[in-house]
């Protein structure tokens, strides 16, 4: 497995891309995609934090694990976890139609999510982003950058 610091940097970079895409989509008619990208951005920030504590996982619902490992680091942990959990609860709904149960109407994310849903998701992501991104930047700045095979420094 790769170095946990490099894994953290990779998650931070990819989370940054997702967050910037969410910023572009915010306020457009693409509500489901705004939610999907905010959700992905926050998941990657949480995974960046977890990697720094030696935890690398493919799981998606990480708010409880994050709380357990970082409780002492954030005085607003309850609020942080509420925002992370709010995004985790969407699951795959922003990206895929749900049609398994005939007794329920088919869920079509691009049709069924609204502007208010996207705004709430963005607000949650923004809160988490403003708390975790500076934390990660500060911690990762204490580690030397590793050169890739192409000779470029990783952020």
Identify the meaning behind each predicted range.
Residues 1-155:
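Terminal alpha-helical segments
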């Amino acid at each position: 497995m790769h170095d946990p610091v490099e894994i953290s940097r990779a998650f931070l970079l990819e989370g940054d891309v997702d967050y910037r895409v969410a910023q572009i989509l915010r306020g457009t008619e693409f509500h489901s995609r705004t939610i999907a990208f905010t959700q992905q951005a926050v998941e990657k920030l949480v995974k960046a934090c977890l990697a720094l504590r030696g935890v690398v996982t493919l799981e998606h619902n990480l708010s409880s694990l994050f709380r357990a490992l970082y409780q002492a680091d954030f005085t607003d942990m309850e609020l942080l976890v509420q925002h992370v959990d709010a995004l985790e609860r969407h699951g795959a709904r922003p990206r895929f139609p749900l049609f398994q149960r005939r007794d329920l109407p088919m869920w079509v994310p691009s049709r069924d999510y609204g502007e208010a849903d996207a705004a709430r998701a963005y607000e949650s992501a923004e809160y988490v982003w403003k708390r975790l991104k500076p934390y990660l930047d500060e911690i990762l700045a204490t580690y030397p950058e590793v050169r890739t095979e192409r000779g470029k420094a990783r952020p």
